[in-house]
């Protein structure tokens, strides 16, 4: 089928966000634009919310914002104009220091208490130090033990750590305590929500005062029976030029592909996709791709010919 709209990828302009734990790689290694060169924690690569509204960098929609496309060109996204919010947020995170230990609510809790969507997220590890570990889940047997260990600040005993390597992939469900640790750089695909309950911030100060914790809400939503272990980490092992699905949840699907030569993957979802070029460079149906680019693949667009030497991750929302 295909309408006049659906014949090109729509590239988005990344926006950097300052964070006290951020580094300088987003500017120096990814080439993203910023006036400063430290504490650059997050690249909001494809974003459509009150904080950042991604802008199209080239082509037919150049200069338009994602919110405008979402509202005015629903067919690009394979949907009706139904007043719902853009579903996903794509970030690259550069943690020079540890991020706070945190947890996110699910949709039900967030809608009731925050008038927001909940936050499910997942991580594709782009870089990390040797022997890196992420904090995912806890060792608490039940809610009473969790409460006691938090009150007594027994963080080392409480927090579960999992080893990770470059190229690993991890799903973080709402209710699972988690933290990105110093030195890790990752691609995050998440629900379009910013509701975070901070449990522990290493007693750090920001402008002389500790950042606020949200222990009560955190206790409400922490899932103590989550079974997170080393087996929860996916080690993608696909051959070159073969698309590999990393995860399928009720909110999104994520795939990765390493292209070396030519790959043809066609259409891989019934909605639109968001593509992120994580390594290398090449072309997709003639359009140039290089590391650090993020783009919308319109509904009905077919990824017929991806060529070059590059890795791309794709995310698709699941429409409810
Ligand atoms: Zn999080």
Residues covered by each model-derived region:
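Intrinsically disordered, low-complexity linker/loop segments enriched in Gly/Pro
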Residues: 107, 118, 127-161, 165-166, ...
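Ligand-binding loop in jelly-roll beta-barrel domains
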Residues: 85, 93-98, 107, 118, ...
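Short beta-strand segments in beta-sandwich/barrel cores
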Residues: 263-264, 279-284
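C-terminal amphipathic alpha-helical segment
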Residues: 197-269
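Short acidic-glycine-tyrosine-enriched beta hairpin
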Residues: 159-171, 285-303
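His/acidic/aromatic-lined binding-pocket segments of jelly-roll/cupin-type domains
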Residues: 90-91, 99, 121-124, 161-162, ...
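Double-stranded beta-helix
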Residues: 136-157, 186-228, 315-320
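Transition-metal
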Residues: 1-141, 203-229, 254
């Amino acid at each position: 089928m295909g309408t006049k709209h659906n014949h090109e990828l729509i590239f988005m302009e990344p926006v950097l966000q300052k964070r006290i734990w951020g580094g300088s790689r987003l500017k120096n290694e990814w080439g993203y634009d910023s006036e400063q060169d430290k504490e650059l924690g997050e690249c909001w690569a494809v974003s459509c919310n009150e904080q950042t509204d991604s802008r199209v960098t080239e082509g037919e929609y150049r200069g338009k914002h994602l919110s405008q496309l979402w509202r005015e060109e629903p067919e690009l996204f394979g949907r009706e104009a139904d007043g719902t919010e853009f579903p996903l947020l794509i970030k690259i995170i550069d943690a020079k220091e540890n991020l706070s230990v945190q947890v996110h609510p699910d949709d039900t809790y967030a809608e009731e208490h925050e008038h927001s969507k909940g936050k499910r997220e997942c991580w594709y590890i782009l870089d990390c130090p040797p022997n890196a570990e992420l904090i995912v889940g806890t060792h608490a047997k039940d809610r009473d033990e969790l409460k006691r260990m938090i009150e007594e600040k027994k963080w080392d005993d409480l927090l579960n750590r999992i080893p990770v390597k470059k190229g690993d992939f991890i799903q973080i469900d709402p209710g699972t305590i988690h933290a990105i640790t110093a030195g890790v750089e990752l691609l995050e695909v998440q629900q379009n929500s910013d509701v975070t309950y901070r449990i522990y911030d290493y007693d750090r100060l920001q402008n002389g005062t500790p950042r606020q914790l949200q222990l009560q809400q955190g206790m409400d939503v922490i899932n103590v029976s989550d079974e997170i272990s080393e087996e929860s980490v996916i080690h993608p092992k696909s051959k070159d030029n073969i698309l590999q699905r990393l995860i399928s949840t009720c909110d999104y699907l994520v795939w990765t592909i390493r292209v070396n030569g030519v790959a043809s993957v066609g259409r891989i979802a019934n909605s639109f996709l968001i593509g992120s070029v994580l390594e290398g460079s090449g072309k997709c149906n003639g359009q140039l791709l290089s590391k650090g680019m993020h783009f919308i693949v319109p509904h009905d667009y077919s990824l017929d010919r991806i060529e070059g030497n590059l890795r791309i991750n794709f995310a698709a929302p699941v429409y409810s």
